Amino acid sequence: MRGAMLNPIVIAAGGTGGHMVPAESVADELMRRGQRIVLMTDARSAGQKSAVFAGCERHVLAGAGLAGRSLGRRLLGVAQLARGTVAARHILAKLDAAAVVGFGGYPSVPPVLAAATLRRRPAIVLHDQNAVLGGANRFLARFADHLALSFEGTVGLPGRARATVTGNPVRAAISVLAASPYEPPAETIRLLVLGGSLGARIFATLVPEALARLPEGLRRRIALTMQCPGEAIGAARGALDAAGITHELAPFFSDVAPRMAAAHLLVARSGGSTVAEVATIGRPAIFIPLAINTDQRHNADVLARRGGAFRLDQATTTPDRLAGVLESLLDDPLRLAAMAEAAASARIEEAAARLADLVLSAIAERVR
């Protein structure tokens, strides 16, 4: 029967970790349920190591983003997407896929478009990681059987979309720490600063300058762990040493999950995955969204409205402004504990299982 193990489920995802992490989580859940998974991705992600997709058939498709590009680059991007769609259609027809699950971004466009044109059309499910529906998903929603959302109240939904809030699947290392008890700081204050896949350059100057403005007694209590671009580590270390801040700096931490669970307060960007991880573990946060990304502002507001986070806009956040917020929070452990509880209230349990259920339900609808 179509939809059983011989008919694979195609995962269409690529680009950044924000798209790949939920794709991996759901693929892992579906494989544990006996489903065969095929990955369709882009050249950027083709070489990335993934324990989940290591044994899966994978296909690298042509494609390119269109937003913010010149007319010439857009025309070239359209041509690449068309080429990727033709290739995806041939592959999907040969596979007789039961479903295509897209995770946003341009790598999802060719497989979903191709699926929509097949005579034996597979089920199409789209997942969006942000509180604002992304451009690719807005375009593809007209072809989807179901649209899976990470947040209640997601902005930009098409009127006829069959939308279900599943939550944003997070990494297994985060899931096992769900609802870890929060212990307010007594003496040492553990501050964790995350800036995306390779650190945010602005944090490397903003955070040390803000910490230097705190009262000396508070500075002496802080143990800072900060993700920092390699070329900025020297200057950041010098500023932190001068301020008397205990610190650990690196471009990347492989063990972010336990560091997040141990933190008393986070300062971070507010990509969909980061916000989902903060809610899953339940930790207070100061979010400074990427200045050009309205999605991140809306994501941050999901926790800020509940009292679990502060949102500070990058354009108006000076060292003095950040120092003021840090001091008000770090001097008030009961407030931090209340924020942790509020952040955890936004957690959506078993997001990967919920999305897997939706995919299998969409397949069942197609074979009826």
Curated annotation (Swiss-Prot):
Catalyzed reaction equations: di-trans,octa-cis-undecaprenyl diphospho-N-acetyl-alpha-D-muramoyl-L-alanyl-D-glutamyl-meso-2,6-diaminopimeloyl-D-alanyl-D-alanine + UDP-N-acetyl-alpha-D-glucosamine = di-trans,octa-cis-undecaprenyl diphospho-[N-acetyl-alpha-D-glucosaminyl-(1->4)]-N-acetyl-alpha-D-muramoyl-L-alanyl-D-glutamyl-meso-2,6-diaminopimeloyl-D-alanyl-D-alanine + UDP + H(+)
**Protein keywords:** Cell cycle, Cell division, Cell inner membrane, Cell membrane, Cell shape, Cell wall biogenesis/degradation, Glycosyltransferase, Membrane, Peptidoglycan synthesis, Transferase
**Pfam families, A to Z:** Glyco_tran_28_C, Glyco_transf_28
Q: Does the keyword Repeat apply?
A: no
Q: Which InterPro entries match?
A: GlcNAc_MurG, Glyco_trans_28_C, GlycoTrans_28_N
Recorded GO cellular component terms are: plasma membrane
Pathway(s) served: Cell wall biogenesis; peptidoglycan biosynthesis
Q: Name one GO biological process term.
A: carbohydrate metabolic process
Q: What is this protein called?
A: UDP-N-acetylglucosamine--N-acetylmuramyl-(pentapeptide) pyrophosphoryl-undecaprenol N-acetylglucosamine transferase
Q: Which organism is it from?
A: Acidiphilium cryptum (strain JF-5)
